[in-house]
Amino acid sequence: PLYEHGFDAGVIEKVIGEPVAALMGGSYADKVEAQRRVVRCGLQLGYDCIPFERGMVSLVQNGQALMGHAPAIIKTMADVEAYPWDTKLDEYIRRFDEDFSALRDALPEGMKAVGGIGNGLFETLQDFVPFQELAFLQMDEPEVYELLWSRIGDMMVALWTWMLENHADSFAVCRFGDDLGFRSSTLINPADIRK
């Protein structure tokens, strides 16, 4: 197989019989070793690439609102304007540049990763405003709704530009996932997605 969307650290540990999760948050050498073990697992299972991403929602509410476990942090235009958008690129770099570098140092010749900046625009939007509240925001505060999409899009462009300029060589395919709905229908109007 070419690619798996994600390797769970617990599964990797069972496959290779060595710890991985504890190393991911350790020193740089630990992170490189963790990625080497992920690579070893991928190779052992017959994969040509390994999955690797560091998500945008880690900059918002760490996916808590996306999963329905946290309230909206954007409700008004003042909330959008007060949000520290201009700090998010630096925060992402501080948190994850070392992880991307460890990946590069761990990849054997001929192997690459698939991924990059995790979470798409819609998933990230829902970490600012959970899905149900998002529907109300769209109807009650359409200007806030539109501006929030735009600001998140700008943040995505900044993050992807940084990643591609600094770490693209580690990737065979750069991609993000965005859960937009189901087979039968999207969760929001397709026209909103196209914007």
List each language-model region with its residue ranges.
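Active-site loop segments of alpha/beta catalytic cores
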Residues: 1-31, 48-52, 65-195
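Glycine-rich, N-terminal phosphate-binding loop and its surrounding beta-alpha-beta segment
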Residues: 34-63
